[in-house]
């Protein structure tokens, strides 16, 4: 099994390489559209996850205009959900950070100079040089800003990646073949059942947290965990009885949760 994350910048050629890798390994490609489709399986409405479309302009503004913590939890839930299969090519969405502790994932960064990226956009999208420069500048600012906001890390930090490919030196086909060959190594291809089970539990936990945040629940004094599929356990404290009641109501509205275990106390006089 091959689980690969690919991080790219607009115009770097990363999407082409990702498609070739997925086709060469005969595994699924999880781009924006596919991740949104997977979100539906978690009972996440399309309009909720569409806010995280990395290709659409205004990414950072869209997140800040909503409930940012809730949407970050949704993003994590979807990434963990698709990763539990142990194979696939995931494009962006912080997947290199979310899966950094899973040894079975190969994290790849596709790099190209700004001048090469500008020329690629001019040729591929028939843009003027000024338009291409503006589009790349805006895309870079939004992606870097979002990543820093979500993870407090620099998107360009080389320590986040197992492999960095410069597409000015290595063509798309050669890059794809190199990734395919590397993913076949024993260290990368062996993904334990324990790791896959952990991803599924983390996906369920993040989905529950996102639902609670959407319902204006303060998670500061709450601990959410998913010991097994369909089960959620919440321990901690709420400021009011109303907040505690809203937690129960929110969880009961989640059809995928069949066993809700709680030990929630109401603080006397608030926090």
Residue ranges and their predicted role:
Residues 88-124:
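ATP-dependent NMP and nucleoside kinases share a basic, alpha-helical "lid"
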Residues 28-40:
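Short beta-strand-centered segment that lines the nucleotide-binding/catalytic pocket of NTP-utilizing
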């Amino acid at each position: 099994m091959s689980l690969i994350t690919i991080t790219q910048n607009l115009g770097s050629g990363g999407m082409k390489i990702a498609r070739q890798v997925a086709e060469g390994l005969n595994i699924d490609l999880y781009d924006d559209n596919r991740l949104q489709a997977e979100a539906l399986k978690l009972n996440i409405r399309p309009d909720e996850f569409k806010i995280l479309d990395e290709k659409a302009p205004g990414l950072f503004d869209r997140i800040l205009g909503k409930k940012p913590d809730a949407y970050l939890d949704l993003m994590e839930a979807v990434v963990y959900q698709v990763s539990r299969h142990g194979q696939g090519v995931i494009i962006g969405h912080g997947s290199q950070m979310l899966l950094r502790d899973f040894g079975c994932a190969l994290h790849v960064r596709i790099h190209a100079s700004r001048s090469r990226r500008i020329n690629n956009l001019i040729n591929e999208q028939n843009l003027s040089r000024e338009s291409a420069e503006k589009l790349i500048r805006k895309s870079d600012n939004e992606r870097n800003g979002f990543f820093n906001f979500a993870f407090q890390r620099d998107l360009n930090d080389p320590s986040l990646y197992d492999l960095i490919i410069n597409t000015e030196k290595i063509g798309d086909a050669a890059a794809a073949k190199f990734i395919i060959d590397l993913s076949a190594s024993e260290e990368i291809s062996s993904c334990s059942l324990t790791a896959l089970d952990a991803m599924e539990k983390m996906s369920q936990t993040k989905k529950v947290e996102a639902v609670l945040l959407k319902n204006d629940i303060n998670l500061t004094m709450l601990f959410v965990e998913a010991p097994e599929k369909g089960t959620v356990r919440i321990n901690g404290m709420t400021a009011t009885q109303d907040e505690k009641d809203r937690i129960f109501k929110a969880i009961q509205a989640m059809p995928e949760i069949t066993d809700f275990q709680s030990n929630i106390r109401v603080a006397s006089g608030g926090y």
